[in-house]
Amino acid sequence: MRPDVISSFAYNKIMKFTRTKKVLFTNNKGGVGKTTLAFNCAMSFAKQGYKTVLVDLDPQCNLSRLSLGDNRYEKTLFASQEKDVYDVLKGVVEGGADIDLSVPFIPVPDSNNNLSLMKGSVNLSLYENILVTAYGQAAAGQQLGYFQTSAIDRFLRAKGLDDEIDIFVIDTSPSLSLLNQIIFLGADYFVVPMMPDAFSVQGIENLGSIFEKWKQNWKVTGKALSGNTESKFVLSGDGLFIGYIVNSYNVYGKQPIKDHRHWIEELPAKVKKYLSEKHGRNGLVEKSWKTPLAEIQDYGRIPAKCQEIGVAIFDLDPALVEEIHLGTKENIEKSKDEFGILSDRILKILAEY
């Protein structure tokens, strides 16, 4: 194995939690900044000393591109030694083998050696193809179905234990696909990024109801029929909603513009009814809807530049975009505060629940 591949995990440490935490950033609505939020939040975890792995489960691989930067990502596409999530699943998809636990994570720079990536793959669609049959088999209590549907979750659990990972931050495509259903049923927690607009407010009911349907269906079928099946092959289906993020609000005089403020004020009631009360637990029910985990402003062209070179918004050199974006330095400083609040609140929840 190449030294640069294992460098981020080449030392022993005491885990921050009693077990590895799997946090899913999810929304079936595209354009809400889910991938950008996941990356920047994970980088913030890493800089605070949490051993974190980004897991790219979107066949479009946007998280991989953002984490590595355009140039480095494109080089990995043609490097046979660079493994991705499909290499993990290939034996399960093609038959005759199980998940490949030897597939390494790729270190992400500028993270205090605490952040790595499970690179995405366009071939994830091949895994989704077998899920159509596999989920039906698992729902009927058949062993092959459990084996195939649990593949990603088993990989994360095993690597989390072996590599002493504190947090997996998982990104998926903006859809309600069967692949995303399987990922959702394996997650410990989920966060929902939203835009301050009418479409996000309207979409909360649909999203919360579908998540509830997924959980309930699995509870009365695959989980109920699992019998003596080893627990690691049975998805938990108990993902806890820990909060929402208001992303890309526009500012005027350091406050959200009037139209965005209106929709921000509409969100809590919907979140309470369709997400917190259906997918929360104990004291977290109220905490998860009363206020967002964070409000992240629209940073204009800054995120695009960050993707090009593979850095977090708060780590960007202002000189790289100052000529085309006035106020860049001030915005980058503000992003440190906003993502600091977001990561601190999530970490506190992970410690308590």
PLM features: residue spans?
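P-loop NTP-binding core
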Residues: 2-353
